[in-house]
C-alpha cells in the first residue's frame, strides 16, 4: 500500500481535465465483442478503452475462455472462439463486472471454468446470478467465490426470475449473453427496488447498438431475442463517474473545472450526475464535447437519493462532510453499497468520524452533519472510490493522508498524477504539488 498525502487547495481550482474511458462501457464492449467473435461475425474493435485493473481482469478472463484480445493501450481487437483450455481459472480480482458478466459467458463453453478473486470479492453478492444460471440448466459448484461453472457448449435460455436488489449487474450479466442462447432470454426482476438502473439501461443501449433485439417496455422485465451480435467498432466514452471527484474540486474550492470529451448524448448516467451537482450551488455549462462546473466554494447540506448512481456515494459523502458547518445532508437509496468493494456505508461513516466529522448510518444511507475536520489518516479499504473521496476531503483539510492511493488503479491508475496536474494548473508559475 502507498500512503499519499492529499494535496490542499488553498485557492480556487481552475483546470481542464481529460479522464480515460468508462470502465462500465469498456467491460460491456469487451463481452459483446467476445460474443460477436465467437459467433464468427468478424473482428470487433474498441477505441478509447480504459486500461486499469478492472478492465485488464476482463481481458484476462476473455483470454482464459480462449479468446484473443490484442492491444496494449486503449485500442483493442477481439477475435477467436470460446474454447477454454484445461484447468481454466478466471481471476475476478475485486471487479464486479468480471464476477457477474463472465459466468454466463463461461456457460457457453464446453469446459469447466473456475472463478476466484480477491479476499474481499468473496463477500460480494453473487448467489442470485448463480441460482439463475442453475435455473437455466447450468451446472455450478459453489454459491460464492470460489465456484466452478460446468459449461456444455450451448445454453437454451428461456425465462428466469432473479432478485437483483443487491446488484443490477446480475441482470446485465444475463442480458449481455442472452442473444447467444438458443431461445434467447427473458429476465424478470422479483425483488425490492432495483439499484443502479442506469447501468442496466447502458447494457440495453449497447446491446441495441450491437444489433440485438431487446424489449424493455415492461418495468423490471427484459426480453432478448436470439440472434447475431454485430462485430462493430466500439468508441468508449470518458468515465463520467471518475470525472466527479475532479468536478468536486471546483465545488469545494470555488473554482472552475472543465472535463473534455463529455458526451452530449451518453450511455452513462450523465443526467443523474448533473442533478447531484445542481444541489451544490454549482453552475454547470455543457457543450457538445465538454462539461464545465463552476463552484461557489460554499454550499448547504442537501438531500439526495443515490439509488440510481450508488458509485457516486463516496464523493457525495465527502462533499457533504465539507458543506457549511452545522448543515445536514441525507444520502438515501444506497443500502446495496454494503455489498460493494467494501461496506461503503460503514467505511464512510468510520472515516468521516475519524477526522472529527459527524456521520451516522441509516438503514438505506447516511446522515452527515458538516463539522470542521482535522488532519488524519483516511483508510481506503482497497476501494478506489473511497481513496478518491479521501482526496476530495484533503482539498479542504490539511494533513489528510490516504493510506492506499494505489486502490485507484482499479478504474483510474493515473489518478494521483491527474489530481496533482489539476491542482498545479491553479498554482503560480514555478510551484507544483507532489504526486
UniProtKB/Swiss-Prot annotation:
Protein name listed in UniProt: 3-phosphoshikimate 1-carboxyvinyltransferase
EC id: 2.5.1.19
Localization annotation: Cytoplasm
Alphabetized HAMAP family for the sequence: EPSP_synth
Quaternary organization: Monomer.
GO MF terms, alphabetically ordered: 3-phosphoshikimate 1-carboxyvinyltransferase activity
UniProt: phosphoenolpyruvate binding residues: 23, 96, 124, 169, 344, 385, 410
Gene that this polypeptide is encoded by: aroA
Domain of life: Bacteria
Biological process (GO), any one: chorismate biosynthetic process
Keywords (A to Z) from UniProt: Amino-acid biosynthesis, Aromatic amino acid biosynthesis, Cytoplasm, Transferase
Catalytic activity line of the entry: 3-phosphoshikimate + phosphoenolpyruvate = 5-O-(1-carboxyvinyl)-3-phosphoshikimate + phosphate
Organism whose genome encodes this protein: Mycolicibacterium paratuberculosis (strain ATCC BAA-968 / K-10)
Active site, UniProt feature: 311 (proton acceptor)
Role according to the record: Catalyzes the transfer of the enolpyruvyl moiety of phosphoenolpyruvate (PEP) to the 5-hydroxyl of shikimate-3-phosphate (S3P) to produce enolpyruvyl shikimate-3-phosphate and inorganic phosphate.
Amino acid at each position: 500500500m502507498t500512503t499519499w498525502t492529499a494535496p490542499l487547495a488553498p485557492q480556487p481550482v481552475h483546470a481542464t481535465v481529460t479522464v480515460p474511458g468508462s470502465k462500465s462501457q469498456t467491460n460491456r464492449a469487451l463481452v459483446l465483442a467476445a460474443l460477436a467473435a465467437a459467433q464468427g461475425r468478424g473482428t470487433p474493435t474498441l477505441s478509447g478503452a480504459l486500461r486499469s485493473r478492472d478492465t485488464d481482469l476482463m481481458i484476462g478472463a476473455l483470454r482464459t475462455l480462449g479468446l484473443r484480445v490484442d492491444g496494449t493501450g486503449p485500442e483493442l481487437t477481439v477475435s477467436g472462439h470460446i474454447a477454454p483450455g484445461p484447468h481454466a481459472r478466471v481471476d475476478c480480482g475485486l471487479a464486479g463486472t468480471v464476477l457477474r458478466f463472465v459466468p454466463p459467458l463461461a456457460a457457453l463453453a464446453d469446459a469447466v471454468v473456475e472463478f476466484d478473486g480477491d479476499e474481499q470479492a468473496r463477500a460480494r453478492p453473487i448467489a442470485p446470478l448463480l441460482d439463475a444460471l442453475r435455473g437455466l440448466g447450468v451446472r455450478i459448484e459453489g454459491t460464492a467465490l470460489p465456484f466452478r461453472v460446468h459449461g456444455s457448449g450451448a445454453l437454451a435460455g428461456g425465462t428466469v426470475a432473479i432478485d437483483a436488489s443487491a446488484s443490477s449487474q446480475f441482470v446485465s450479466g444475463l442480458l449481455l449473453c442472452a442473444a447467444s442462447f438458443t431461445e434467447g432470454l427473458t429476465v424478470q426482476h422479483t425483488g425490492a427496488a432495483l439499484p443502479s438502473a442506469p447501468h442496466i439501461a447502458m447494457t440495453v443501449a449497447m446491446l441495441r447498438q450491437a444489433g440485438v433485439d431487446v424489449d424493455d417496455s415492461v418495468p423490471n422485465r427484459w426480453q432478448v431475442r436470439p440472434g447475431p451480435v454485430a462485430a462493430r467498432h466500439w468508441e468508449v466514452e470518458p468515465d463520467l463517474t471518475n470525472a466527479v471527484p475532479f468536478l468536486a474540486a471546483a465545488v469545494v474550492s470555488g473554482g472552475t473545472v472543465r472535463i473534455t470529451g463529455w458526451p452530449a448524448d451518453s450511455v452513462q448516467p450523465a443526467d443523474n450526475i448533473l442533478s447531484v451537482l445542481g444541489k451544490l450551488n454549482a453552475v454547470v455549462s455543457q457543450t457538445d464535447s465538454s462539461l464545465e462546473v463552476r463552484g461557489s466554494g460554499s454550499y448547504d447540506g442537501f438531500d439526495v437519493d443515490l439509488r440510481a448512481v450508488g458509485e457516486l456515494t463516496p464523493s457525495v459523502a465527502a462533499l457533504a462532510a465539507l458543506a457549511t458547518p452545522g448543515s445536514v445532508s441525507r444520502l438515501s437509496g444506497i443500502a446495496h453499497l454494503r455489498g460493494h468493494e467494501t461496506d461503503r456505508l460503514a467505511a464512510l461513516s468510520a472515516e468521516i468520524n475519524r477526522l472529527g466529522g459527524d456521520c451516522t448510518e441509516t438503514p438505506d444511507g447516511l446522515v452527515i452533519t458538516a463539522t470542521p475536520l482535522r488532519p488524519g489518516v483516511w483508510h481506503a479499504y482497497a476501494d478506489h472510490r473511497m481513496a478518491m473521496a479521501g482526496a476530495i476531503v484533503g482539498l479542504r483539510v490539511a494533513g489528510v493522508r490516504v493510506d492506499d492511493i494505489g486502490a485507484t488503479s482499479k478504474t483510474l491508475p493515473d489518478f494521483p498524477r491527474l489530481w496533482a496536474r489539476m491542482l498545479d494548473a491553479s498554482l503560480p508559475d514555478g510551484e507544483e504539488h507532489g504526486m
